[in-house]
């Protein structure tokens, strides 16, 4: 079989939207090469789990590589893929010095290329995300989340995912009920289950994402706790009195449903919102306040922000 590699050079803020577009067009795997991963200083208490090579990363910005089976249909779609990516600017997503290149690769290159960018990632001193193909021996009481990131949704390496998992670790109590909005790979639902949640509803509008989530949930043996539903945000979700709602999605999307979050939460319930670039944090913060939520804490990693808010006790 012949494969094509689509290489997109863009900004950190555009990573998830670009990866999602490529996946929706049928990419069989996506890798993300971000120089920030190389330059990021890691705290010694988490330890260095893997060695990064500087030559694997771009000088600036992010390179996203997606792999497509080279068919006549794919070749015809190439201009449409490029234009769809360029159209992301209409949603105020900066693409930077956008570059779009298509190369041919052989079977062996495809099978290994995207995997070399995924390694075990220690999120907290208790939680580590491990690619499903890697052997990893956990320490005592360490929580392991196994992921197959081949569908490009939320591998755990992105700062917003890490911010959400750390917040879940801080706020989730055993027996809590959780809603995970925009679940992607299911990583936040799986983390919630392994932290002791009693029940989790994981929603995503994208059918490919819900399938990826179901596969990862089964891989982690948490399907008895997590229900996956293809759904647009919290529309027609009648659950109330929920302990935690978590959403790792773009700021523009978070702005669409803070009132629905308020209705879903029990008094004192927590909303963990990330996917927020730093310069849009104030707008999201104000929207949450206007919906009646109280800002509890704001955390930041690099250019990304997580806002933790709660419904007041009535």
Swiss-Prot record:
Alphabetical keyword list: Cytoplasm, Methyltransferase, S-adenosyl-L-methionine, Transferase
Keyword Nucleotide-binding attached: no
Residues reported in the UniProt entry to bind S-adenosyl-L-methionine: 161, 182, 204, 248
Function summary: Methylates ribosomal protein L11.
Molecular-function GO term, any one: protein-lysine N-methyltransferase activity
GO aspect biological process, one term: methylation
Reaction(s) this enzyme catalyzes, per UniProt: L-lysyl-[protein] + 3 S-adenosyl-L-methionine = N(6),N(6),N(6)-trimethyl-L-lysyl-[protein] + 3 S-adenosyl-L-homocysteine + 3 H(+)
Protein name, entry field: Ribosomal protein L11 methyltransferase
UniProt cross-references to Gene3D superfamilies, sorted A to Z: Vaccinia Virus protein VP39
Chief subcellular location: cytoplasm
Pfam family, one: PrmA
InterPro entries, sorted: Ribosomal_L11_MeTrfase_PrmA, Ribosomal_PrmA_MeTrfase, SAM-dependent_MTases_sf
EC annotation from Swiss-Prot or TrEMBL: 2.1.1.-
GN (gene name): prmA
Family indicated by similarity: Belongs to the methyltransferase superfamily. PrmA family.
GO (cellular component) term, any one: cytoplasm
CDD domains linked: AdoMet_MTases
Places the protein is found: Cytoplasm
Source domain of life: Bacteria
């Amino acid at each position: 079989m012949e494969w094509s590699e689509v290489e997109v050079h863009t900004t950190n803020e555009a990573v998830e939207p670009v990866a999602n577009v490529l996946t929706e067009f049928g990419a069989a795997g996506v890798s993300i090469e971000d120089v920030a991963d190389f330059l990021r200083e890691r705290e010694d208490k988490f330890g260095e789990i893997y060695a990064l090579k500087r030559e694997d990363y771009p000088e600036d910005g992010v390179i996203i590589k997606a792999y497509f089976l080279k068919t006549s249909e794919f070749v015809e779609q190439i201009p449409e893929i490029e234009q769809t990516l360029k159209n992301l600017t209409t949603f105020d997503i900066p693409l930077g010095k956008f570059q779009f290149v298509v190369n041919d690769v052989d079977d062996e290159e495809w099978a290994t290329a995207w995997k070399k960018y995924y390694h075990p990632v220690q999120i907290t001193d208790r939680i580590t995300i491990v690619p499903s193909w890697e052997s990893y021996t956990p320490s005592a009481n360490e929580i392991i989340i196994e992921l197959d990131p081949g569908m490009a949704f939320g591998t755990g390496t992105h700062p917003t995912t890490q911010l959400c998992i750390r917040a879940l670790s801080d706020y989730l109590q055993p027996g809590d009920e959780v809603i995970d909005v925009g679940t992607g790979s299911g990583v936040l639902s799986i983390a919630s289950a392994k932290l002791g949640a009693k029940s989790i509803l994981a929603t995503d509008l994208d059918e490919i994402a819900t399938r990826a989530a179901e596969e990862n949930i089964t891989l982690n043996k948490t399907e008895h706790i997590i229900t996956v539903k293809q759904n647009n945000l919290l529309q027609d979700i009648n659950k109330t009195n929920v302990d935690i709602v978590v959403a790792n999605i773009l700021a523009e999307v978070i702005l669409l449903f803070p009132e629905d979050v308020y209705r879903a939460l029990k008094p004192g319930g927590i909303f963990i919102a990330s996917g927020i670039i730093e310069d849009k944090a104030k707008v999201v913060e104000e929207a949450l306040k206007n919906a009646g939520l109280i800002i509890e804490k704001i955390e930041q990693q690099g250019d990304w922000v997580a806002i933790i808010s709660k419904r007041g006790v009535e």
